[in-house]
Design a protein with these regions (language model features):
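Active-site metal-binding loops of divalent metal-dependent hydrolases
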Residues: 5, 144, 190
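Phosphate-coordination/substrate-recognition cap region in phosphate-metabolizing enzymes
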Residues: 32-97
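Short glycine-rich phosphate-binding loop at a beta-alpha junction
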Residues: 42-50, 130-141
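Short, hydrophobic/glycine-enriched beta-strand segments
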Residues: 1-4, 140
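GST superfamily/GST-like fold recognition
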Residues: 144-148, 178
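Loop-to-helix element that buttresses phosphate recognition and phosphoryl-transfer chemistry
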Residues: 3-57, 104-117
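Acidic, low-complexity terminal tails and accessory targeting/binding regions
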Residues: 70, 76-87, 129-136, 152-212
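Short glycine/proline- and acidic residue-enriched helix-loop micro-motifs
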Residues: 91-114, 202
Length: 212
């Protein structure tokens, strides 16, 4: 899983759901940095959010010609909190988080979890149909809160489990299995040798970046 590169609103900490902000130059650089890493990996399928920040990241990473749009990979619908920072929201709702309170006129974690489950079902079906030998690999390009929710859902924690998982712009997360157990193989990493995409030789590292 790959979070899109930096945007102006992400850098300002503004909740960026369906507002279609473009990548900053630094966000495009983050996306291009993925290309040499991913070129060595045979993906059976590539899915991307149709929002331009994710789609452009996918293109710059080298998959624009083969990516399939997936509306369920779109970021949370933040409703009335679109474009608003957490600090601003907490002036009226102390302790607010997207995980605990949801978004008026938008989505809550239960609604997002339904979308995450649909993405997982689609990904598993694509993996089962992959002609590549060995374990199938799929690439998903999306957004911070959505991909965190997806990881939580994969692990059986529900979308709310994403509260425990930070994913910076341009960050990488790898979901997979240890035997039959669903696990995180890598989390919040940045471009590195291809072997680490398999969860070896070391776990994910990296400091969180600001933004939603």
């Amino acid at each position: 899983m790959f979070r899109h590169g930096a945007t102006d609103w992400a850098r300002q900490g503004r909740h960026t759901g369906r507002t279609d902000r473009p990548l900053l130059p630094e966000g495009e650089a983050e996306a291009r940095a993925l290309a040499p890493l991913l070129a060595a990996i045979p993906f059976g399928a590539v899915l991307t959010s149709p929002l331009q920040r994710a789609r452009r990241t996918c293109e710059l990473a080298g998959f624009g010609a083969v990516a399939q749009p997936c509306s369920d990979l779109m970021e949370w619908d933040y409703g009335r909190w679109e474009g608003i920072t957490t600090a601003e929201i907490r002036r009226t709702i102390p302790g607010w988080t997207v995980w605990s309170h949801g978004c008026p006129d938008g989505e809550d974690k239960a609604m997002v979890e339904q979308r995450c489950s649909a993405v997982i079902e689609r990904a598993l079906a694509l993996a089962a149909a992959s002609p590549e030998p060995g374990p199938a690999r799929l690439a998903l390009f999306g957004h911070g809160h959505l991909l965190r929710s997806l990881a939580g859902t994969w692990l059986g924690l529900g979308a709310g489990g994403g509260a425990l998982l930070v994913l910076g712009t341009g960050g990488i997360g790898v979901l997979g299995y240890e035997r039959e157990q669903r696990v995180l193989l890598r989390w919040n990493g940045w471009p590195a040798p291809a072997a680490t995409m398999e969860g070896r030789p070391e776990p994910a590292s990296g400091s969180p970046l600001p933004g939603q």
